[in-house]
């Protein structure tokens, strides 16, 4: 039975929600006032995810990716936003989340998605894309850097390296391991993980707060966010019934269930794409300046 790191989970939720909440307050977002409480929560969480994606990339590029730097960044950013928007701050009340059929439908949808998605991969092929993302996230959480400083590589001359290394496909650099672990030059003894950085960043963040096994939960969480986003998008473009039907069909889709259990970038990409399309639709309807930027 796995123990849940409740403190880490609580900090992770706050760190992704509070920046989005404060940014919408700072912009005095009048276009949000008549939205349903659950829809406002989704927008604020989505903005928080976008903000943290840039923050995590910035810290990783500085090779400062770690709990102290992330927590300090959250405190500084949120503290600054609270001070700037201190005259507009309001504590959100859960009493606004009154039970209606729409709320019951959304809760039922989330429960269904949780049942289907909450079984992250238990085994990974080391040279497979899923393992590269996962191992890259664990390495990032451990070292704070996107690069691996390989002591064996540092001890080799270029002549020796040619004997023990092999070239990647299509001239993609030298490699000492199977999979997308590349060595681009001999000046810096770095092994660089292939594929996209963003998935690896979120895997590293979840690993820091939830432990090594927590890094596998990035895909299920963003799979849930994608389902909720499609629900609100369909509701805004068409009707409540169409939004619910689209979200249910996505949840029950075999490909969605499969990819929501693997630490790949598809769920993160899907959640951000649907979220961006939703915000664009909302902007077209309401013409909020800051909303258009997001």
Please describe what each predicted stretch is.
Residues 1-100:
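Membrane-embedded, hydrophobic transmembrane alpha-helices
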Residues 8, 12, 43-44, 191, ...:
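Alpha-helical transmembrane segments of multi-pass integral membrane proteins
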Residues 18, 78-88, 205, 214-237, ...:
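Transmembrane-helix motifs of polytopic, lipid-linked glycan transferases
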Residues 102-127, 138, 142-145, 151, ...:
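Transmembrane signal-anchor helices characteristic of membrane glycosylation enzymes that use polyprenol
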Residues 142-207:
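Interfacial juxtamembrane loops and adjacent helix segments
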Residues 238, 276-292:
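Membrane-interface transmembrane helices that cradle and orient dolichyl/undecaprenyl
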Residues 246-251, 278:
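Short helix- or helix-capping micro-motifs
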Residues 255-269:
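Short acidic/glycine- and proline-prone juxtamembrane loop motifs at membrane-interface regions
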């Amino acid at each position: 039975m796995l123990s849940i790191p409740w403190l880490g989970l609580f900090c992770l939720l706050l760190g992704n929600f509070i920046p989005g909440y404060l940014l919408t307050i700072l912009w005095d977002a009048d276009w949000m006032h008549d939205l349903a409480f659950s829809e406002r929560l989704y927008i604020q969480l989505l903005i928080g995810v976008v903000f943290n994606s840039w923050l995590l990339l910035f810290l990783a590029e500085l090779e400062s990716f770690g709990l102290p730097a992330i927590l300090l960044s959250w405190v500084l950013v949120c503290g600054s936003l609270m001070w700037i928007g201190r005259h507009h701050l309001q504590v959100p009340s859960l009493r606004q989340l009154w039970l209606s059929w729409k709320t019951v439908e959304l809760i039922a949808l989330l429960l269904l998605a949780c049942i289907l998605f909450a079984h992250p991969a238990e085994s990974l092929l080391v040279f497979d894309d899923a393992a590269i993302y996962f191992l890259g996230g664990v390495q990032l959480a451990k070292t704070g850097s996107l690069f691996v400083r390989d002591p064996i590589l540092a001890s080799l001359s270029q002549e020796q390296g040619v004997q023990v290394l092999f070239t990647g496909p299509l001239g993609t650099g030298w490699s000492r391991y199977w999979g997308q672990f590349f060595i681009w030059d001999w000046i810096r003894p770095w092994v660089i993980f292939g594929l996209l950085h963003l998935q690896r960043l979120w895997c590293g963040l979840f690993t820091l707060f939830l432990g090594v096994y927590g890094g596998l939960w990035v895909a299920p969480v963003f799979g849930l966010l994608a389902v909720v986003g499609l629900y609100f998008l369909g509701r805004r473009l068409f009707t409540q019934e169409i939004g619910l039907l689209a979200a249910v069909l996505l949840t029950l889709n075999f490909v969605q269930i499969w990819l929501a259990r693997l630490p790949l970038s598809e769920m993160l990409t899907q959640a951000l794409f649907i979220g961006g399309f939703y915000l664009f639709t909302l902007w077209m309807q309401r013409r909020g300046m800051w909303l258009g930027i997001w």
